[in-house]
Design a protein with these regions (language model features):
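Carbohydrate-active catalytic/glycan-binding domains of CAZyme proteins
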Residues: 1-124
């Protein structure tokens, strides 16, 4: 579900690459609080792409998809799946994230694998 922020509803979605239908990327958009059918901003560039080894080695190589997100203090944390085999997380400063999205800049998320199919845990 979208996250309520002071600037609007923050929504994450996944989409296929135009160049390669086997690759899934994650995008973000900000919707109006009172009228969520109105898109205020949409990230020009994907916010997550399958560029880590654990996002390209598994049941569905080249696939990342957000399964949840939460705002903790001034950080936004996205929980996502990598290659349908790994539980992953990515995070960024919320203010910087929103600023980058509004300015059509590339959004830099710090990411890492949390747990893989063998239940090995790795801190991000």
């Amino acid at each position: 579900p979208p996250l309520k922020t002071k600037e609007g509803w923050l929504l994450f979605y996944h989409a296929m690459s135009k160049d390669d239908f086997s690759k899934y990327k994650v995008g973000a958009m900000l919707l109006d609080l009172k009228d969520p059918s109105k898109v205020l901003y949409r990230a020009k560039h994907p916010i997550l792409i399958p560029d880590e080894c654990y996002e390209n080695d598994g049941y569905k190589p080249g696939v990342v998809y957000v399964s949840g997100a939460v705002i903790i203090g001034d950080e936004i944390v996205l929980h996502y799946g990598g290659a349908d085999s790994y539980v992953c997380a990515a995070h960024a400063n919320l203010e910087e994230f929103m600023k980058s999205m509004k300015q059509d800049s590339i959004i830099n998320l710090k990411k890492g694998k949390i747990k893989n199919k063998n239940n090995d845990i790795k801190k991000i």
